[in-house]
Amino acid sequence: MRAFVLRARSAPTDSQLFLASVGQEPHTEILAHTLMNTIFVAQSHRNDVVVYLVLESTHDFSRTICFDTRNICHIGGFHEQALLTKIAKALDISRGMTKEQTRVVDEGITVSTISFEKLVQDLAVDYQLFMMDKKGTSIREQEFVGNPCFLLTDHIPMPKKSFNTLKRLGAQKISLGPKMLFASQCVVLIHNELDINQ
């Protein structure tokens, strides 16, 4: 099983603000692009992937939306608008939730009020954690054992204090090459390497 976590530090947890932020400073379209490239293949979707979108621009708690492809039946289409609508629906369903609650959005999709840090702590139990770093081990030289989990960010870099927490949890740095890439591009390269080596 492959897991991907996209930490969207500027993405609003209010559904209307989220939708209004497409193409604006928060760049919420990044979530749809990354989700699209993580889940879908031509004429179908992968059935061995879990994607966590962590939206952090909030007045109360971060929202973590989980897409588990083993259980997803219908997501509304392969296009950006369908994915943005699904994320907005999850945010609407999350209204009024208290800390560390989870609600079902649709088959294979849940929304939780857990932070990025708590999510990664939980994932570290079952997954081998990787964070992107130009100075890390090349993905082509990295050995993947068990279930890999890849930690990505939107256009706002990961805070330095998060790196220390991730290191303590055993996260390893991997490189996809010398260029800084969009999260949506990273997932394509990661999938390709793992597919080739399966």
Swiss-Prot record:
Residues in coiled coil: none
GO molecular function, one term: S-adenosylmethionine-dependent methyltransferase activity
Organism, as annotated: Shewanella baltica (strain OS185)
EC number: 2.1.1.-
Pfam families: Methyltrn_RNA_2
The protein's name: Putative pseudouridine methyltransferase
UniProt-annotated binding residues for S-adenosyl-L-methionine: 132, 186
Homology family: Belongs to the methyltransferase superfamily. TrmY family.
